Amino acid sequence: MSSSNKNWPSMFKSKPCNNNHHHQHEIDTPSYMHYSNCNLSSSFSSDRIPDPKPRWNPKPEQIRILESIFNSGTINPPREEIQRIRIRLQEYGQIGDANVFYWFQNRKSRAKHKLRVHHKSPKMSKKDKTVIPSTDADHCFGFVNQETGLYPVQNNELVVTEPAGFLFPVHNDPSAAQSAFGFGDFVVPVVTEEGMAFSTVNNGVNLETNENFDKIPAINLYGGDGNGGGNCFPPLTVPLTINQSQEKRDVGLSGGEDVGDNVYPVRMTVFINEMPIEVVSGLFNVKAAFGNDAVLINSFGQPILTDEFGVTYQPLQNGAIYYLI
């Protein structure tokens, strides 16, 4: 029993693959035959893929010629010039006009990128100095110069601006030990209106007091606003007036002319036991300042050599760090 195509559901119907086969062909041939023929013909046509063009692999000779042309100033060659370049490069290998054109475009883009990167990275000047303001000591002594390692001493109430008498006696005074105060073995001197003096009591640097000591306002050794905040030590200033009766070796001065009253040699700041102290530049008398048994070492742990009187062979370095043992 057979039935015509017009009685089939629409989902099985398909259009003819060729316009020459008209309605009469549909009646004679079932629709599924047309469907299979269409698929077969389309599958055969899809297999006909054109061969890909070979990729251009430039030869070293071709690259050298292109670079020389680009460096000579030819950045965007016209079509006629591209053809002449292509003919010249064909001697070393296969190449097309499009390859030449795109090479110049890419070369121009790379040159612009290199120039842009060069302008965005300026060179550091040798005169620039690096300052590290991150340590706790910077809040007291200012910034630290990385090249010299010096701590600039700021203005402080403890810095003596007027002449004052300053002695380095080498005798033991019990009253000085009672008025001295400090940190461990290192005792801090106090600047008074009558001057200040050091003595060697218990191998520490102590104070000789007078009757006006109670009139001196309290000194904030920890910096800050005076309310106990902070942990910084203000720089101590050694007055520079030299007593004429004191020997030159006792005040840390080397030979030369006699030193009289009201003589102000050059001052410098050194750090002894992490505290800044201003001393006279030149040779320093360790025994006169800190006692007969005192030994001064540098930041490398090497002792500072002195003669039999305690005078250093070399002057102390400005801004250097020393330790008293």
Swiss-Prot record:
Pfam families: Homeodomain. GO terms for cellular component: nucleus. Keywords: Developmental protein, DNA-binding, Homeobox, Nucleus, Transcription, Transcription regulation. Residues 51-115 bind DNA. It comes from the Eukaryota. One of its GO terms (biological process) is embryo development ending in seed dormancy. It is found in: Nucleus. The keyword DNA-binding applies. Expressed only in the egg cell. Not detected in the pollen tube. Expressed in the zygote, the basal cell, and later the suspensor. Expressed in all suspensor cells, except the hypophysis, and in the embryo surrounding region (ESR) endosperm cells. Strongly expressed in the suspensor cells, with a weak expression also detected throughout the developing embryo. Disruption phenotype: No visible phenotype, due to the redundancy with WOX9. Wox8 and wox9 double mutants are embryo lethal, with embryos disrupted as early as the first cell division in the embryo proper. PROSITE patterns: HOMEOBOX_2. Gene3D superfamilies: Homeodomain-like. PANTHER family: WUSCHEL-RELATED HOMEOBOX 8, WUSCHEL-RELATED HOMEOBOX 9. Probable transcription factor, which may be involved in embryonic patterning. May be required for basal embryo development after fertilization. Acts partially redundantly with STIP in promoting embryonic cell division and proliferation. Promotes cotyledon boundary formation by maintaining the symmetry in CUC genes expression domains. This is WUSCHEL-related homeobox 8. It comes from Arabidopsis thaliana.
